[in-house]
A protein has these predicted regions:
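Conserved nucleotide-binding/hydrolysis micro-motifs of P-loop NTPases
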Residues: 15, 39-45, 94-96
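Short, low-complexity, polar/charged sequence segments that are solvent-exposed and flexible
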Residues: 28-29, 54-56, 106-110
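NTP-dependent small-molecule kinase module
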Residues: 80-137
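A glycine- and Lys/Arg-enriched "phosphate-lid" helix/loop adjacent to the NTP-binding pocket
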Residues: 31-79
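Short, glycine/charged-enriched secondary-structure capping and boundary segments
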Residues: 23-26, 49-52, 102-104
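Glycine-rich phosphate-binding loop used to anchor ATP phosphates in small-molecule kinases
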Residues: 1-40, 73, 88
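Secondary-structure transition/capping residues
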Residues: 9, 57, 61, 88-91
């Protein structure tokens, strides 16, 4: 695809291994990988937002799936950043804002005010549970 000049965009929750394999393969093919990751402080906030969306006619997601995907997405974030040429992280807990930028795995910019979920994510080291090599096989 790259040799033919194609670019593409993939919207994802970063859950499961298939998205990591897709990103890895794209990287191997020479694509520039750019991630824009949006998160909120808790699954409870996500549930509330989804309930509001349902009231307005949007689709729902079962609570158990929200909880599962919330944690899984954060666990995959470290591995995904490792594959990215550029990763911008956004917090949407209260007001949507970008607060961190990674370039080639290095944190190059971070706001003075960082969200709770990001602090917790760094402290818990979610990246330690499964190696990237195990996930892309």
């Amino acid at each position: 695809m790259k040799s033919e000049g194609y670019t593409f965009n993939q919207e994802t929750t970063l859950c499961g291994h298939s998205i990591l394999r897709t990103i890895y393969r794209a990287k191997q093919l020479g694509y520039i990988i750019e991630l824009h990751y949006v998160c909120v402080d808790s699954p409870a906030i996500a549930k509330k937002r989804i309930a509001e969306r349902v009231k307005m006619g949007g689709h729902g997601i079962p609570d158990k799936d929200i909880e599962k995907k919330f944690g899984e997405s954060l666990r995959n974030l470290h591995k995904t950043i490792d594959l990215c040429d550029l990763a911008a992280l956004y917090d949407n807990t209260d007001e949507f804002r970008r607060f961190a930028i990674y370039k080639n795995v290095q944190l190059i910019r971070v706001s003075k005010i960082i969200p709770k979920w990001y602090k917790k994510w760094q402290e818990e080291g979610h990246y330690l549970d499964t190696s990237l090599d195990e996930m892309i096989q």
